[in-house]
């Protein structure tokens, strides 16, 4: 009668424990004592249950049985061997097998046991079968990753490698006119593309081109504004089609190539854009790494360097708030809470501000900028969003803070961040000089000292996940983790995968309700949908779409109900509208364009209405006496109340 595979497994365990015992030097023992221990273990293991992936406890169980097996096989007692071989080890096999899901269990074959006998001799005596399986699969997957992914990133783009491309590098600081020159050349294209970091910049190019009589389409993750017979596509860099050929391309803000989260899109654009003429606009710090990428492709390049068109001066005296406020000032802080706090204080002093921060919808940011451009507001309060190519008539940049939270910790601004923001002062054509200052002598000294330090060149290039790995026979999260663990050669560094793994984990809990969860191409589309994972209402809507996208030709409309209040409620709803559009496009669903445009318009109007109202409620006050706190106070309590509490 042919043995079942379970019997084969039991025999494998017995053989491994017996072989391990032969290598050990036995010592005289009281056999009766060990018979008692064997019976006790046989009884306890019969009812043992372990949660999935409880590997430490399972390994410990294997080690306990190893000690019992040493005595059993050394003593060669028939009764002891019966208890071990017929009662304990079969139950150990059961416990081990309960750790495997149905798909994983397919790998447990006689060939796999042969491999364990050869490469993992005796390992089952100290480690669970799942631990050995995980180690083996990891090794196999790493080998497969090395096989599938070219050793050199440029080889992932064979079409671009086969072309003769010429790069023109426009290198200069902010307000130097580098992007203007590249766009002037783009106007001559019959089939051109602009690739920028922000929807607002794509919109600016879209409007300038169409105003100049050059048909231009805008394409971003949030929307598509299609113009018939367009010669130019203005888009965010993530939207690049690496299979489409252009005659001229412009890649803007290429110093972003080092960004942990989005930098891989610039790397992909430089290595993979199919255009005979490619203009790259960047800060001087990115010059060497961008040239390195071009050299990898054996393409030609020329360098055009630009000087700042207006002088930039650091003021001698620190800024005092609100006494020193002047029209044309831009106040820099690093959170939405701080932006609204400063805006409220300015309004208290009769000064109308525009506000710019990351969670504002792009169209609202644009309207706030327009108010400032048209002098309907006197100043602007912004996060570092102001530093990324936004053209505003700013006379002076005022750093109210010189520290920011970067997602991990609160840290001082680095020189590249200071220069990027400070460079927005003194718009060419409006001012001869741009000014920079900071609140308080300590902050001003920090700016002064930091600006004297030579800016470090970028020495990192971000690499994205290669989708060729989606062909591998393994869970998607395991593939992503193993790919990320493998260190690339300098100057490459792999993108941060924390957010997509978070979304994978969120979806995995509901995998039985997600159609085609095992389709890695489909699942990867879902988990790389760009959403704010800090907004849990948004994450829940994303999960609902994952579970229901096959139900109809269109997705359900976003839920207006929210636990949030005021501005946050409408900002979150706007993000839900963006998710409705993005998920629909990714999954081939029909978008109700008229409804979406109407909802966006209504939501934008509501946000603008709320921003036009008094921001007194956002001013940070002492939680005890209600007194307005000094800017930068981190305790939410005034000095007098703090002193009273400390008495």
Locate predicted features:
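Conserved helicase ATPase core of P-loop NTP-dependent helicases/translocases
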Residues: 224-226, 354-355, 360-383
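Non-catalytic terminal extensions of ATP-dependent helicases
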Residues: 1-147, 466-647
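Inter-Walker segment of RecA-like/P-loop motor cores
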Residues: 209-245
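Conserved strand-helix element at the start of the C-terminal RecA-like helicase core
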Residues: 191-202, 279-281, 324-349, 353-357, ...
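Conserved interdomain linker/interface between the two RecA-like ATPase lobes of SF2 helicase motors
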Residues: 168, 284-287, 293-295, 299-345, ...
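Post-DEXD/H (motif II) to motif III coupling segment of the RecA-like Helicase ATP-binding lobe
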Residues: 256-307
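Conserved segment of the helicase C-terminal RecA-like domain
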Residues: 285-286, 392, 396-399, 403-406, ...
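Conserved Walker A/P-loop ATP-binding site and its immediately adjacent core
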Residues: 176, 180-183, 188-211, 286
């Amino acid at each position: 009668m042919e043995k079942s595979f379970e019997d084969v497994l039991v025999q494998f365990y017995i053989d491994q424990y017996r072989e391990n015992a032969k290598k050990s030097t036995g010592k005289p023992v009281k056999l009766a004592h060990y018979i008692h221990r064997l019976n006790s273990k046989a009884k306890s293991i019969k009812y043992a249950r372990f949660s999935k992936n409880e590997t430490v406890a399972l390994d410990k169980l294997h080690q306990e049985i190893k000690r019992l097996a040493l005595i059993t096989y050394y003593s060669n007692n028939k009764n002891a061997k019966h208890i071990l071989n017929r009662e304990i080890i079969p139950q150990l096999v059961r416990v081990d097998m309960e750790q495997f899901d149905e798909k994983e269990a397919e790998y447990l074959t006689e060939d796999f046991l042969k491999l364990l006998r050869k490469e993992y001799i005796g390992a089952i005596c100290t480690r669970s079968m799942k631990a050995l399986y995980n180690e083996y699969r990891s090794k196999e997957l790493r080998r497969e990753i090395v096989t599938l992914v070219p050793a050199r990133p440029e080889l992932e783009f064979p079409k671009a490698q086969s072309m003769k491309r010429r790069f023109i590098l426009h290198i200069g600081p902010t307000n130097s006119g580098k992007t203007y020159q590249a766009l002037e050349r783009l106007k001559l294209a019959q089939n051109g593309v602009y690739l920028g970091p922000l929807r607002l910049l794509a919109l600016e190019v879209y409007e300038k081109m169409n105003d100049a009589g050059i048909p231009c389409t805008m394409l971003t993750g949030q929307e598509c504004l299609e113009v018939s017979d367009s010669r130019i596509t203005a888009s965010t860099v993530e939207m690049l089609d690496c299979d489409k050929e252009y005659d001229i391309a412009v890649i803007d803000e290429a110093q972003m190539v080092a960004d942990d989260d989005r930098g891989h899109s610039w790397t992909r654009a430089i290595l993979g854009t199919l255009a005979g003429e490619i203009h790259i606009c960047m800060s001087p710090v990115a010059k060497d790494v961008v040239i390195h990428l071009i050299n990898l492709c054996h393409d030609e390049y020329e360098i055009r360097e630009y000087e700042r068109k207006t002088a930039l001066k650091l003021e001698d005296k620190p800024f005092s708030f609100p006494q020193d406020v002047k029209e044309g000032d831009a106040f820099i802080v690093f959170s939405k809470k701080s932006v609204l706090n400063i805006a409220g204080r300015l309004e208290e002093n009769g000064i109308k501000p525009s506000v710019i921060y990351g969670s504002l919808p792009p169209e609202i940011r644009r309207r706030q900028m327009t108010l400032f451009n048209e002098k309907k507001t006197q100043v602007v309060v912004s996060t570092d969003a102001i530093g990324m190519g936004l053209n505003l008539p700013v006379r002076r940049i005022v750093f109210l803070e010189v520290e920011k939270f970067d997602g991990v910790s609160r840290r001082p601004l680095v020189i590249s961040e200071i220069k990027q923001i400070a460079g927005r002062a003194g718009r060419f054509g409006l001012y001869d000089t741009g000014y920079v200052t900071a609140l308080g002598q300590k902050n001003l000294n920090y700016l002064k000292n930091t600006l004297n330090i030579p800016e470090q060149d970028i020495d990192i290039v971000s690499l994205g996940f290669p989708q060729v790995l989606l062909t591998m026979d393994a869970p998607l999260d395991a593939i992503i983790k193993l790919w990320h663990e493998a260190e690339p050669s300098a100057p490459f560094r792999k993108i941060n995968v924390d957010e997509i793994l978070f979304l994978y984990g969120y979806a995995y809990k509901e995998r039985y309700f997600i159609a085609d969860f095992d389709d890695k191409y489909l699942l990867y589309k879902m988990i790389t949908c760009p959403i704010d994972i800090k907004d849990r209402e948004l994450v829940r809507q994303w999960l609902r779409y994952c579970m229901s996208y096959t139900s109809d030709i269109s997705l359900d409309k976003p839920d207006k109900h929210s636990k949030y209040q005021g501005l946050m409620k409408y900002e979150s709803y706007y993000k839900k509208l963006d998710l409705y559009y993005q998920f629909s496009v990714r999954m081939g669903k029909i978008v109700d364009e008229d409804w979406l445009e109407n909802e966006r318009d209504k939501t934008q109007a509501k946000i603008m209405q709320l921003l036009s109202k008094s921001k007194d409620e956002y001013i940070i006050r002492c939680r005890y006496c209600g007194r307005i706190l000094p800017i930068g106070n981190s305790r939410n309590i005034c000095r007098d109340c703090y002193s009273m509490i400390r008495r």
